[in-house]
């Protein structure tokens, strides 16, 4: 009887864990292993002004996503203040968020503006985003709360950025 209750509890706990990880995966742009930014070190964007590949052995979890780091010092800085280093819009394309969509990113296409990390889908998309950067950030900030928990496939892009 005790084994049955324990098993039931473990199954229920596992279901809750997987549900929370699945939920978080919709809120952050991750690979199949749950890694964000394709394994690039989130802190390096700020300290080195470039995308530096991190190591799986030096990692931290934030908002359901696994972050890799190029050094323990960077990991520790991230853990001390993850909201400072985590990419905006869950690591989805900043331009996409501005038009109400979630697109994957190329983590080497980025900008740090006002101490916030923005990543985009490609160099071409980044050019579009840069041309209307202030408006794009304002729109994305406004829209993110309503699209954050919606899966990418359920969203339809709009043309608000073109107005």
Question: What is each model feature region?
Answer:
Residues 10-11, 140:
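Generic hydrophobic, helix-prone segments enriched in Leu/Val/Ile
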Residues 1-10:
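Bacterial N-terminal signal peptides that target proteins for export
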Residues 23-163:
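Charged, low-complexity intrinsically disordered segments
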Residues 19-21:
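N-terminal signal peptide c-region/cleavage motif recognized by signal peptidases
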């Amino acid at each position: 009887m005790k084994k049955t209750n324990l098993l039931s509890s473990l199954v229920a706990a596992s279901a809750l864990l997987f549900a929370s990880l699945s939920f978080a995966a919709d809120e952050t742009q991750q690979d199949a292993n749950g890694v964000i930014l394709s394994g690039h070190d989130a802190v390096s964007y700020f300290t080195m002004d470039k995308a530096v590949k991190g190591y799986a052995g030096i990692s931290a979890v934030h908002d359901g996503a696994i972050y890799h780091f190029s050094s323990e010092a960077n990991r520790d800085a991230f853990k001390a203040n993850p909201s400072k280093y985590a990419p905006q819009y869950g690591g989805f394309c900043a331009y996409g968020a501005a038009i109400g969509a979630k697109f994957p990113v190329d983590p080497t296409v980025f900008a740090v503006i006002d101490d916030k990390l923005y990543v985009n889908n490609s160099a071409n998309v980044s050019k579009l985003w840069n041309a209307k950067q202030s408006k794009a950030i304002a729109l994305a900030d406004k829209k993110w709360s309503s699209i954050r928990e919606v899966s990418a496939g359920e969203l339809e892009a709009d043309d608000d950025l073109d107005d």
